[in-house]
Amino acid sequence: MSATDRYSHQLLYATVRQRLLDDIAQGVYQAGQQIPTENELCTQYNVSRITIRKAISDLVADGVLIRWQGKGTFVQSQKVENALLTVSGFTDFGVSQGKSTKEKVIEQERVSAAPFCEKLNIPGNSEVFHLCRVMYLDKEPLFIDSSWIPLSRYPDFDEIYVEGSSTYQLFQERFDTRVVSDKKTIDIFAATRPQAKWLKCELGEPLFRISKIAFDQNDKPVHVSELFCRANRITLTIDNKRH
């Protein structure tokens, strides 16, 4: 390829890349939406597949697009910043982001407290309410949240709770319990098949797993939880202050 041909190819690639960015910015292709196939884009922009492929690869590398094997290429959802030191429920989190929230309960049942009795400081022969929900931010799945709530401390919580209600508000209004602190640990977890289904991601895709113990105003454990979120959908921040 001559220098002139290489220059011409670079101009075409840069033009196609910018047009794709413009279409995304103008809402032609929205977050989570699949873009046209390479063949369709070749026809639309009247360029070669090599040019289209390079433009798409660059936008994938920049985090603008994401390739899903066997499905196609999609517009990447904007990352959400989640401050690790924030102690609030999901509803409050959505308000802080200026976004709407929604939840879908995928599992709720009474189970043995034995695996959680030490963390919750409750008898091993008691029961906890297991609540598993998919949490949506602006209609996009963001988290899978599994919580275990001690029924010995919060009787009939499973009967009081209804889908869509804030668990933290229920703690405060029904049991005079305010969640004021928590302890979190974070690791990376490969998405299982059910998690991939609910989070609309690839099987084995990296997820943040945030394990938490929440404490009330008297420093008693309120609940334990595990939150799973796509690593490419959220930015975790840690604020440290020297005392």
From Swiss-Prot:
One biological process term in Gene Ontology: negative regulation of DNA-templated transcription
Domain HTH gntR-type: 10-78
Protein name: Probable fructoselysine utilization operon transcriptional repressor
Molecular function (Gene Ontology), one example: DNA binding
Pfam families recorded: GntR (PF00392), UTRA (PF07702)
Metabolic or biological pathway, per its Swiss-Prot or TrEMBL entry: Carbohydrate metabolism; fructoselysine degradation [regulation]
Free-text function comment from the UniProt entry: May regulate the transcription of the frlABCDR operon, involved in the utilization of fructoselysine and psicoselysine.
Start-end of DNA-binding region: 38-57
InterPro entries: Bact_HTH_transcr_reg, Chorismate_lyase_/UTRA_dom_sf, Tscrpt_reg_HTH_GntR, UTRA, WH-like_DNA-bd_sf, WH_DNA-bd_sf
UniProtKB keywords: DNA-binding, Repressor, Transcription, Transcription regulation
Keyword presence, Protease: no
TM stretches of this protein: none
